[in-house]
Amino acid sequence: LYKTTEELVDSLIRHAHTAVASGLVLGSGGNISVRTPGSDEYFITKSGTWLDELTPASFARMKIGQTGPFDSRPSSEWKLHDRIYRTRSDVNSIFHLHPQTAVLLNALGYEIRFFTLDDALYVKSVGVVPYHPNGSDELADEAARQMEKHNCAILAHHGCCTVGEDPEMAFRRASLLEQAAQNTYRAMLLGDKETAFPEGVELIHA
């Protein structure tokens, strides 16, 4: 359990570095946030920050529902984070990354299949958000709608959005989403279009 805001931000930074090292995002792409549990305060990466160079000073402090003025310039995707926190009171962390295989499969019209128990347990289902301009109200609103039913969503021709009760779970889901996409791609290369994790088996392990 995280006892302080500083511990939450430190966890966010660690998992952001891992996300870059894993190839889930490059350069200044992506944005992440963490909410202080039980409050309307959250911290989101500032505009233009690189996720592998984050420090505690790389975050803007926000309040859910705030539209400005801001003490620091938040990521251009702050509306997406804000809308999801408003929609999901159980969510304390949001990762918006750019997993290339997941985005590619979606763009080509292929459904991402689950092959492992972790995929089925932690990802469970994947929402799809049609393309909308970066930072737009339309993107934020549709992402929040998808997150009413899913913990992971593909943002068409853009990236993914994953949520969790803490940064570790939000990152885990993003990583597993891309793993499932890569395995789907490999299966397709081998000519397989049907194999997937047995339906309902994950309930035994929940």
Task: Enumerate the language-model features and the residues they cover.
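Glycine-rich flexible loops
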Residues: 1-206
